[in-house]
Amino acid sequence: MIIVILPLLFLTHPIFAEQFNFTLQSFEVALSMFLIVCSMILINMYIEYRTPLFLFLSTIFSSWSFLTYQSLIMFYISLSIAIVILLLNFNKNLKLLDYLKVISLFLLVFICSMIITQSLIFIGHQMFSIKSTNYLNSKITWGKLPFFEILSILKSHFKNILLAKVIFYNLGFVISTLSCFLIFIKKIILKSRFISFEILCMLLLNLSPFMLTIFMGNVEPIRSQMPSMQFVIAFNFLYVAINLTTKSFLAICISLALVISFRQGVTTANLFYSERAKYEEDVVFANRINIQLDSLNVSDRKDYSLVLIGEKKVNSNLVIQGETLGRSFFAWDLGSPYGTSSRAVGFMRTLGYDFKHPSKEEYKKGLLLKENMSAFPKKNSIIIDNNTIFIKLSD
């Protein structure tokens, strides 16, 4: 029954909903997560059988995963630390040097994988003239903002996590870490072997989901904490459960894990429902726009650029919003060079309304015209100027 805690808390976490909303990443990221787990298994097989092939395959699997999604680097670190902690609890006759040898293997595979990853990226840039984006570097605030301002940003973020102020977080992290602290007190009293080392490992494990946040000095998208965040919560509960000897306390621990899993599952289901409801509302709104355009004798959409000014948010009270889930295509990128037009036009095209994307000049012209326009669907909310359609969505 204890082992059920891990998959239940791990698989039901709402961060997965946010991540797998990116359909084009779904298979690749899921496969890479599986390969990281396989890499861990292969390292342990090497420890037992001393077959170099296992270490080689482990490095290949890790390299593949690191290339696929950067947050899986943190997942590798989390799993490595968790395995060391399990060894400390189940292989208590080992010497400290034995544990350090295991850690050295994890480090060896990690370093080799990072070297392979960076080498392949460099070769790809040179051979195919692929330009690297500035996406990650642009979010790093160290050296760009005052030190204490960065600390304030991080403090606010960690406070939101600990107090579960964001829909993706719950009290599972706080409850599990406090429970681990109580286990540490018990082990210190009983003078357990290598307790200082074990506490250090647990501290690093619980910091691992936030390594990217600390590295950037900024709040990254929630999906970048996937899957380390949910793994750490699940492992904390598992760690507490395997160290409880009283059946009543064990029952309480398992019950708490089940309750948190259920609440996570409900939140995840609500997020997926919200995304579906948002999509259907966007379809209805897109059709309303095109029905009105039909009445204005706009025939072949391919001849027209579509400029949308303002935004249209989801109206349903049943929709809850994540970072991307539940957010209308007609409410994205407000303030960007193309406003909401870019994603909204792309969405329209998936429905068969094959508008052209507007130019920056056309969007700037729309910003000038909006002062004399009403918000859709009122009269004068649509202006057709040559082959450009201007629609004001909001004031």
What are these regions (language model features)?
Residues 1, 6-7, 23-27, 63, ...:
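Transmembrane catalytic cores of multi-pass membrane glycosyltransferases
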Residues 13-17, 69-73, 80-82, 233, ...:
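Short, solvent-exposed loop/turn segments at secondary-structure junctions
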Residues 1-15, 34, 49-53:
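Transmembrane-helix signature of polytopic, membrane-embedded enzymes
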Residues 1-3, 96-99, 103, 123-128, ...:
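Intrinsically disordered, polar/acidic, low-complexity terminal segments
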Residues 42-63, 92-101, 249-252:
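Short hydrophobic alpha-helices at membrane interfaces in multi-pass membrane enzymes
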Residues 173-178, 242-267:
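Signature aromatic-anchored transmembrane alpha helix within multi-pass, membrane-resident enzymes
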Residues 212, 216-244:
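Hydrophobic/aromatic-rich transmembrane helices and adjacent perimembrane loops
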